Swiss-Prot record:
It is a peripheral membrane protein. Heme binds at C435. GO terms for biological process: female gonad development; lipid metabolic process; response to estradiol. Coiled coil: none annotated. Belongs to the cytochrome P450 family. It catalyses: testosterone + 3 reduced [NADPH--hemoprotein reductase] + 3 O2 = 17beta-estradiol + formate + 3 oxidized [NADPH--hemoprotein reductase] + 4 H2O + 4 H(+); androst-4-ene-3,17-dione + 3 reduced [NADPH--hemoprotein reductase] + 3 O2 = estrone + formate + 3 oxidized [NADPH--hemoprotein reductase] + 4 H2O + 4 H(+). It is found in: Membrane. The lineage of its organism: Eukaryota, Metazoa, Chordata, Craniata, Vertebrata. This is Brain aromatase. Its main location: membrane. The gene is cyp19a1. Its cofactor is heme. Its EC number is 1.14.14.14. One of its GO terms (cellular component) is membrane.
């Protein structure tokens, strides 16, 4: 486990130092584009930074590179209001945090495209491949059917048992994640759980979870680093090379796993059950998908959980311990509805307190708090003209704290005491490009939390809360793991039920 942490921290540190060193050089090179561009001036009337003889676009773009996408979005919405206009890599970009504007974009077929650096997407294999950033709509619709089939129906029903089994498996070897002081590396525990779940549901072949997690972390760091970089960044081979190698490392590993799966299928006398990877391989055999399509789809299915669901669970455990009354209510609900047995699919709809807790956690401290889209045709949003090709960033996290909720800046289950209209709460998006895994994500979250909380109460280090730990907000909200020991927690068997933390009952506010 120390190797996982060391590899992750060293790679992330190298990424940060390199990007900071290059920012000045890259922005100077962009000057030529700035002063020769014809369509960068504000034609829409949306509030935002001024042109300033071409310095406005440079300054706004540099802020995104420097602060990260999520943090920069919050900065501009705070400064200019719920609809703000900036420039990213020379392209006019609207940042929306008003519910009416966000809902309009989510529900419309005009905004099913996504924007990012073409070369950046090519680096990570997402340019016109996979499902996450694929803007080849014909191919996207085709592969989405495979994701939908795997993430709904029988796959959804099966996920509860798989989550229970995978969680218990890792909890039974908790000592492998525990240091000499008795603190558990909870982030990597959760990552191992969700990788195991993903493999059992979608790939079903033997793999080294910890080794794969190292590669996933490097890939994710590369994804964040290259997503909105200018083209010149990719010409600097002495810098770009390590990102290219990190992405290729996971792509090659996924290629090997897919080939291993293919051989396993060929060696079967009878195929009683199919899964996500099997369906994709059959599609390739019928020339419906390419080898690269299959590899990228499997890659995206496998990486989706470790750096979204696992981090969400981590934040939820922190919030739970900051709100001990809520933890008490959840545990009592589990005991009354489930008792000593394992949770089953039919139990989930009975766990109302847990449901409200998860929703409030996703609202109050989301891992992914924005969505990137592109206008396919001219449109109008809340009275503002949106030209074809305009980029849009939907600042969902800020929207969740600025409208509708009675206590928007406080973690409080009363925010979900009554039904919340969908236009005001969109943790997974909605409409034609909604997150295809939104239903299974909720099921997995519930199953893992119930299994874990039935056995243990989790105690973070003193002073470790969602508002005090260091975090970055670029592609997603991530705890900074420079000192992973500070993020470790004690796992105390539920029968003992003591943490020794004098601040357990404090209200959580931001």
């Amino acid at each position: 486990m120390e190797e996982v942490l060391k590899g992750t921290v060293n790679f992330a540190a190298a990424v940060q130092v390199t990007l900071m060193a290059l920012t000045g050089t890259l922005l100077l090179i962009l000057l030529h584009r700035i002063f020769t561009a014809k369509n960068w001036r504000n034609q829409s009337g949306v509030p935002g930074p001024g042109w300033l003889l071409g310095l406005g676009p440079i300054m706004s773009y540099s802020r995104f590179l420097w602060m990260g996408i999520g943090s920069a979005c919050n900065y501009y919405n705070e400064k200019y209001g719920s609809i703000a206009r900036v420039w990213i890599s020379g392209e006019e970009t609207f940042i929306l945090s008003k519910s009416s504007a966000v809902y309009h974009v989510l529900k419309s077929n005009n905004y099913t495209g996504r924007f990012a650096s073409k070369k950046g997407l090519q680096c990570i294999g997402m340019f016109e491949q996979g499902i996450i950033f694929n803007s080849n709509m014909a191919l996207w619709k085709k592969v989405r059917t495979y994701f939908t089939k795997a993430l709904t129906g029988p796959g959804l029903q099966k996920s509860v048992d798989v989550c229970v089994s995978a969680t218990n498996k890792q909890l039974n070897v908790l000592q492998e994640f525990t240091d000499h002081s008795g603190h558990v590396d909870v982030l990597n525990l959760l990552r191992c759980i969700v990788v195991d779940v993903s493999n059992r549901l979608f790939l079903r072949i033997p793999l080294n979870e910890k080794d794969l997690l190292i590669k996933i972390h490097r890939y994710f760091s590369t994804w964040q680093a290259v997503l909105i970089q200018p083209d010149v960044f990719f010409r600097l081979n002495f810098v770009y090379k390590k990102y290219h190698l990190a992405a290729k490392e996971l792509q090659d590993e996924m290629g090997k796993l897919v080939e291993q799966k293919r051989q396993a299928i060929n060696n079967m006398e009878k195929l009683d059950e199919t899964d996500f990877a099997t369906e994709l391989i059959f599609a390739q055999n019928h020339d419906e998908l390419s080898v690269d399509d299959v590899r990228q789809c499997v890659l995206e299915m496998v990486i989706a959980a470790p750096d979204t669901l696992s981090i969400s669970l981590f934040f939820m455990l922190l919030l739970l311990k900051q709100n001990s009354v809520v933890e008490e209510q959840i545990v009592q609900e589990i005991q009354s509805q489930i008792g000593e047995r394992d949770v089953e699919s039919a139990d989930l709809q009975k766990l109302n307190v847990l449901e409200r807790f998860i929703k409030e956690s996703l609202r109050f401290h989301p891992v992914v708090d924005f969505i990137m889209r592109r206008a396919l045709e001219d449109d109008e949003i809340d009275g503002y003209r949106v030209a074809k090709g305009t980029n849009l960033i939907l600042n969902i996290g800020r929207m969740h704290k600025s409208e509708f909720f009675q206590k928007p800046n406080e973690f409080n289950l009363e925010n979900f005491e009554n039904t919340v209209p969908s236009r005001y709460f969109q943790p997974f998006g909605c409409g034609p490009r909604a997150c295809v895994g939104k239903h299974i994500a909720m099921v997995m979250t519930k199953a893992i939390l119930v299994t874990l909380l039935s056995r243990f109460t989790v105690c973070p280090r003193h002073g470790c809360t969602v508002s005090t730990i260091k975090q970055t907000n670029n592609l997603s909200m991530q705890p900074v793991e420079e000192d992973p020991d500070s993020l470790a927690m004690r796992f105390i068997p539920r029968a003992q039920n003591i943490c020794g933390d004098p601040h357990l009952g404090e209200k959580t506010e931001e």
